[in-house]
Amino acid sequence: MKTAPEIHLRDVQAVYSGPEGRLWELLMGEQIHIGGLQSSMDLAERACIPAGGRGVDLCCCLGAGMRFLLRFRNVAHMSGVDATPTVLALARERAEAEGVTSRVTFVEANVCATGLPGGSFDFVWGEDAWCYVEDKPKLISESTRLLKAGGIVAFTDWMEGSTPMTAEEAKRFLTFMKFPSIFSLAEYTAQLQSNHCEVRAPQDTGRFPKYVPLYLDMIERQLTYDALKIIGFDQALAGALSGEMHFMQSLAEAGKIIQGLIVARKNG
């Protein structure tokens, strides 16, 4: 596991309460994860998310994943947990706009200690967001606590690839992204297994090196004005952000960072 011990929850909250969060939504859409709807559909299919099920989205952000599951998988109810009040306020507004308020519940809490009752959910869901969590072992423990016996943990995340980053590369990447740490597929698998879960086909989706050029094209070719407006027309900052994204692309092409996908079943 690579770590950036100077990064904490308050730093992540600052990102998603300010211009950086709006910039990510500009580039990636409401579904702020690599692959958008295609990625969500793929994860839901692999996890066999059931119609009529009850799920919890840990690090739900704007609630787009919850609304996807309500609309495309016809789940009965989704709970969403996030520690950033700004994004939860927007999530509630968007749930109301899509007419699903009665089928969602939002909880402001640390995802490592949600306060939700144990054994209450058919599945736990996450999309490219657990990389922001400081204590990933506690996150996995909380995820499995929330599940009924036989329940499913299904998530994608930004992970370290099969070729490790150097210490210098990891520090630069984690600092730019405000990730306190980054796990590999093997590390997530080990944590799930130690929490009595059977892990099914952990894999690299292969999307990372294909999608970062798309985001770069949008910020450098099409949405440049929009991006500059979000960051107060600070062209020096825009250049720095572009440079860090090109660096991130080089890591993805080298297999050092990936979008990993994991589906696991709680024993019992």
Predicted regions and their residues:
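N-terminal, positively charged/glycine-rich alpha-helical extensions of SAM-dependent methyltransferases
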Residues: 1-24
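Conserved alpha-helix/loop element of class I SAM-dependent methyltransferases that forms part
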Residues: 33-51
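Class I SAM-dependent methyltransferase SAM/SAH-binding core
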Residues: 56, 62-113
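A short glycine-rich, Lys/Arg-flanked "PGG" loop and its adjoining helix->strand segment in the class I
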Residues: 137-152
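Short alpha-helix
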Residues: 180-196
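Short, glycine-/aromatic-enriched active-site segment of Class I SAM-dependent methyltransferases
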Residues: 158-179
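A short acidic, Gly/Pro-enriched loop at the edge of an enzyme's catalytic core
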Residues: 112-123
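C-terminal helical/coil "lid" or tail adjacent to the Rossmann-like core of SAM-dependent
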Residues: 205-255
